[in-house]
Amino acid sequence: MPRPILATIHPAAVHHNLERARRAAPDARVWAVVKANAYGHGIERVFEGLRAADGFALLDLAEAERVRALGWRGPILLLEGVFEPRDLELCSRLGLWHAVHCDAQIDWLAAHKTQVPHRVFLKMNSGMNRLGFTPERYRSAWARLNALPQVDEISCMTHFSDADGPRGIAHQVQAFQAATQDLPGERCIANSAALLRHGGDAQVRLDWVRAGIVLYGSAPDHPERRAADWDLQPTMTLASRIIGVQQLQAGDTVGYGSRFTAQGPLGIGIVACGYADGYPRHCDTGTPVLVNGVRTRTIGRVSMDMLAVDLTPVPGAGLGAEVTLWGRAANGAVLPIDEVAQAGGTIGYELMCALAPRVPVVVQD
């Protein structure tokens, strides 16, 4: 019999979150961002929940081929563009749109022989300082692309560095507007945080929005706001079961390093889940967890294959009791992945992407 740990993906929740993104940015078309294998969920597992998207945005050609293999005939955007000249041939064959963020990519297009002109998104570095042309160089890059017979349509895009933070987006919006003024083509600047917080602003939603983490039920601005505050549903549940029970007395310690000491009699459950499954090792005593749908806490240090939970709120729980590490329990109770991530000093994005290959995954609506 296999270990009782299991990850469950919920395509219906993905669909719900996609529709929530649409409501946040009325009249804009939605790129469903499925990079990093749909944020660890599996592109094939969430595809049905995303069929209503206007396009798929991702990182590499292998992911694009997988989306096409699923029968998608609409737009697909390579968010980082091509990584070498020969990639352009496959872009043409698959009908991909791709970002252009540096001079080398323009040079590759200029040298590319094709009968199918490319549709590109010219990326501006408006303050993120990762990829893109600075505002001062943006128009000259646009002119170079516009002169190429290999390019059919040029759209404009940028990425916000602090859409969910105190600095905000006004300075980047202003830089983008100034550099793209009077240039033809569609616009795309809003990521998940921007579309939730500023999607009602026509200067932000523009023609396209990029829905990423919002699709997967995580709040981009947690802990200021929770996923439920945005009407987002959990799309991944990680669950296991209690495989052992211990009755502690005052002075007993738990786990490696004896980081927890019982102050009195205490029942604990040992759960078949550890950092080798993708659960964050930095989650110390007090991290929220659900046992039979009842909220309790972890006890002591997370080990490779196991962790301990406090059974005080669920005294009847024993061997085989359901443990929800994040997501939705059988009784409908929800433990947001963002809460677990915060306890581990990270973000929900990372936990989704870090789910270990040894964890079985099923799809359930």
UniProtKB/Swiss-Prot annotation:
Residues bound to substrate: 130, 304
Pathway given in the UniProt record: Amino-acid biosynthesis; D-alanine biosynthesis; D-alanine from L-alanine: step 1/1
GO biological process: D-alanine biosynthetic process
SUPFAM superfamilies associated with the record: Alanine racemase C-terminal domain-like, PLP-binding barrel
N6-(pyridoxal phosphate)lysine: modified positions: 35
UniProt xrefs under InterPro entries: Ala_racemase, Ala_racemase/Decarboxylase_C, Ala_racemase_C, Ala_racemase_N, Ala_racemase_pyridoxalP-BS, PLP-binding_barrel
Reaction equations catalysed: L-alanine = D-alanine
TM helices/strands, residue ranges: none
Enzyme class: isomerase
Active site per UniProt: 35 (proton acceptor), 256 (proton acceptor)
A cellular component term, taken from the record's GO annotations: cytosol
Physiological role: Catalyzes the interconversion of L-alanine and D-alanine. May also act on other amino acids.
Family: Belongs to the alanine racemase family.
Matching PANTHER family: ALANINE RACEMASE, ALANINE RACEMASE, CATABOLIC-RELATED
Protein name (Swiss-Prot/TrEMBL): Alanine racemase
Source organism of the structure: Acidovorax sp. (strain JS42)
Gene label: alr
